[in-house]
Amino acid sequence: MEAVVNSDVFLTSNAGLKSSYTNQTLSLVDEDHIHTSDKSLSCSVCNSLSQIVDDDFISAGARNQRTKPKRAGNNQSQQPIKKDCMVSIDEVASTHDWSTRLRNDGNAIAKYLTTNKYDTSNFTIQDMLNIMNKLNIVRTNRNELFQLLTHVKSTLNNASVSVKCTHPLVLIHSRASPRIGDQLKELDKIYSPSNHHILLSTTRFQSMHFTDMSSSQDLSFIYRKPETNYYIHPILMALFGIKLPALENAYVHGDTYSLIQQLYEFRKVKSYNYMLLVNRLTEDNPIVITGVSDLISTEIQRANMHTMIRKAIMNIRMGIFYCNDDDAVDPHLMKIIHTGCSQVMTDEEQILASILSIVGFRPTLVSVARPINGISYDMKLQAAPYIVVNPMKMITTSDSPISINSKDIYSMAFDGNSGRVVFAPPNIGYGRCSGVTHIDPLGTNVMGSAVHSPVIVNGAMMFYVERRQNKNMFGGECYTGFRSLIDDTPIDVSPEIMLNGIMYRLKSAVCYKLGDQFFDCGSSDIFLKGHYTILFTENGPWMYDPLSVFNPGARNARLMRALKNQYKKLSMDSDDGFYEWLNGDGSVFAASKQQMLMNHVANFDDDLLTMEEAMSMISRHCCILIYAQDYDQYISARHITELF
């Protein structure tokens, strides 16, 4: 009974309808410079635009398209908006003649709030449920509360609060400066309508027929070309080598460049950009990009990075894992400064946070204790892109390891030192750590009150595991050459998590590469050498380790793995007689496979693992874990227009 009462903490937590977004660090627009496709030593935005011009997308014989004429606007008469005023998100987020049941319900709740003069500063989920009862709004799927709350934010009128007018997308929508129009005219010349449209169409068509890397267009994967040194980062593979709910809709169906275009030219957005726009308008903190000094240039660079990642997604799903120096996304992601986090991030957290922040993706909503004036705490709902797990701050034993499973998943806390949501199981004692505000919202009987979960997930749930033992002393291996020590404390990672009656399966994991050998699980080496990814495909766990192509020992280990996988196919999963086969009938296959690996080509089946091998590696070396619903189930629970 105690658990049921305490679980109401989630329902009565402050929903945070009032916007706290502040963007006072950058100027509106650079009055002295228009970004072009000419390479420049002084402007990183111009450099990235020049790379987009040089990109040779799939042409497929498409006719060059003409840009539609823009509506004439009296930009000269428009005055800059005051910094302290508010603008209704619904004015910005209107779409071309389409609506959904979810959006209509949000309108009804917002109208009820304004008619009855509700104080939105103290609005809670319980208040919303009470209003839904009065309005006869029935929502059986708990996940829909996540989206409904967002729509309530977006449909409140000007008397309530939605978004600060200093948000760059609102400034573009309101045409706050004539220079914005001048810059977008130049962008239209740079982004070839044919090439960009083909890139969008190709990735969206791929998405329709893609499940994971076992359904790639070509199962013969190319890891490297002689003239290239860059490769698709394992974190990108973990996010896009398998189709993840919600993230797929934001990155593949949504497009930042066309979003900017539509906001400025038509003051409306197409349906495929709607959820991307709402994600962006409801983000808590802006990002700052090193070397970019104004808001509009930041949005342009954001659109450039979205396009670069889209091209990487297209290549991943075609089995092309190498890229030219100009196409590498990692250096751009490392230049993003996350103003909501007060600590220096490790390389892998920086890349993960940057990829998600480009589209404002925050799929997890949790109830956490937030300090007030340093003397008390208030329960607030916090949207988070990922949950942080720090084994070095947890005291564990062999009898009580860190466990990520259906029982412990409900324990979250807020780390005031870094501004992040952390995983804090009650049996670990995380609450005594500095800066961490831990209040168990479920009492003791967690499993008995699982239906009252203080966690709502929109499609995917991500964990970042901090294993670097000296993160705060050194950082940035790729720039300083320093080798981090990795804490290989085993974590009990469950392949499945039941949350709110929905099954979330472990879809992918990024692990630290410690030993020199490709499959050396028992290595005593504790120094970081890179990362690799394990995807849980329809054909079993599959490993992506791009660094193995640079190491002869790793190539030999991969060759042995490929040969054993081939022999298991022929012998019905038996290892008996492998070496006799290798010296006899399998010698020709071994020679051809060795030649393939020397040419940096591998088949999908070559890198398949057993479930035991995969979970053993993940337990000791994982740094990123991604759980998600099955994509088909995610789609079937929603109306088609709600997906975008």
UniProtKB/Swiss-Prot annotation:
GO terms for cellular component: virion component. Its main location: virion. It is found in: Virion. The keyword Transit peptide does not apply. The 73-kDa precursor is cleaved to a mature protein of 60 kDa during virion maturation. Proteolytic cleavage of major core proteins OPG129, OPG136, and OPG098, which occurs at a late stage of core formation, is required for production of infectious mature virions (MV). The keyword GTP-binding does not apply. InterPro entries: P4B. Keywords: Virion. Residues 1-61 form a propeptide. It comes from the Viruses. Major component of the virion core that undergoes proteolytic processing during the immature virion (IV) to mature virion (MV) transition. Essential for the formation of a structurally normal core. Belongs to the orthopoxvirus OPG129 family. This is Major core protein OPG129. The gene is OPG129.
